[in-house]
Amino acid sequence: MASNIIMFEDIFVVDKLDPDGKKFDKVTRVEARSHNLEMFMHLDVNTEVYPLAVGDKFTLAMAPTLNLDGTPDTGYFTPGAKKTLADKYEYIMHGKLYKISERDGKTPKAELYVSFGGLLMLLQGDPAHISHFELDQRLFLLMRKL
């Protein structure tokens, strides 16, 4: 049921924090690599709410809705109304995919750029793992430490 609505999921390990230096209070840019799909990611995280350290492992998933039946999100939060995908995760952000790019070469790479209210994510890797995403798509990012 929930696995049908998840468009991407993998386990990541934090390699670096703020690789270009600290830019903002309460926000850390996380550089991480995935275990299974060999993806690379930069992700801005509100570390006052969800602290991360180098070496931490976490599951990251992306889905277009939090509703377990796959129905579109209404945009309204109704606490305790029903079980959602968010119940299985610790840190959730909602944003918009604003850029998709592909690079050709020996090993082709695709890149997704998503903005979560100004917190940015770059997800880079094999185009086969992220080809089903669409420009201007609204997404939920869900994280849980392992």
Curated annotation (Swiss-Prot):
GO biological process per UniProt: DNA-templated transcription
Gene Ontology molecular-function annotations: DNA-directed RNA polymerase activity
Encoding gene per record: NRPB8B
Domain of life where this protein originates: Eukaryota
Gene3D superfamilies per record: Nucleic acid-binding proteins
Reported function: DNA-dependent RNA polymerase catalyzes the transcription of DNA into RNA using the four ribonucleoside triphosphates as substrates. Component of RNA polymerase II which synthesizes mRNA precursors and many functional non-coding RNAs. Pol II is the central component of the basal RNA polymerase II transcription machinery. It is composed of mobile elements that move relative to each other.
Main location class: nucleus
Species classification: Eukaryota, Viridiplantae, Streptophyta, Embryophyta, Tracheophyta
SS bond list: none
Protein known as: DNA-directed RNA polymerases II, IV and V subunit 8B
Keywords for the protein's UniProt record, in alphabetical order: Nucleus
Pfam families linked: RNA_pol_Rpb8
Cell location: Nucleus
Quaternary structure, from the entry: Component of the RNA polymerase II, IV and V complexes. Associates with the mediator complex.
Cited InterPro entries: NA-bd_OB-fold, RPABC3
Annotated GO CC locations: RNA polymerase II, core complex; RNA polymerase IV complex; RNA polymerase V complex
Family: Belongs to the eukaryotic RPB8 RNA polymerase subunit family.
